[in-house]
């Protein structure tokens, strides 16, 4: 097992010993081996959705824990294939993307329709597929930031996918159209028995003010999570909160002083717990993103993110660039270290 305390360094005590005095853990619907029977059984999802959610939970190194380790590789569209795969050209071949997820013991592999369709007959029965339905792309000039549907729910279903995913840029001029598109897509996905995952991201240049990036503020990302759950996301993917007070700094929308005085603190675990509270207190699972590849600190950064997510009550990590921009062996090692956080019974809910 990974020496988690050593990787956390000077933050170890602050993260491993923290007690949450904001939102009590007893009010949350926490991950566990019985999550489908205990939590999802209340909702209106068809039985096939519950079956496919259980398939996710029963796969990989985290099988039976209620936690998820997902490998996402959709960056070939989002960030260009060259920028994404030049470090490891083997990942131009979709086969190797799926092999990385299998070798690392992930619950699921998430990618574009094209990537997964090209190898679906060989792999769809070996590891659960999550098809990302929409993407931003950076080939258009000048660059714009919008999400375009690249595939249909039916295409994902026909290749054997157990889940679909999509991004909404909440706060952008295009967000209301995206909400309508993805709400309809998620409705259809549930009809076909598939799990729905929303990348609930913020996007607006006004969210950066006085040198602070409020795209990762707990209050604004929390509301994005609430909207994600509103349109039927079974799992919400969110960037880890790094600050708070976005509503106040930008001076728009609605908030309450108690969000900052009682429901959050400066501890990152409490900030992520507020993100989770906005996922209907955990009735929709919260997975945090692993972030960009940063070099030598990738392992410690990924473990830190996993510890915060787990102790806040989150459901796992969706980590891609930190893994696939390394050799396959090093990528597997990094993903396994993250999984070790969720397998370690000593790392408890704060």
Model-found features: residue ranges?
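PDZ domains - specifically the beta-sandwich core and the conserved carboxylate-binding loop
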Residues: 289-291
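A short, acidic, flexible beta-alpha connecting loop/helix-capping segment that sits on the rim
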Residues: 321-327
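Alpha/beta enzyme core
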Residues: 25-30, 63, 76-109, 114-287, ...
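N-terminal amphipathic alpha-helix/helix-capping segment at the start of soluble metabolic enzymes
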Residues: 1-79, 84, 117-126, 274
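Hydrophobic alpha-helical scaffolding
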Residues: 43, 265, 295-296, 328
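Histidine/acidic-residue-rich catalytic or RNA/ligand-binding cores of hydrolases
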Residues: 297-303, 327-336
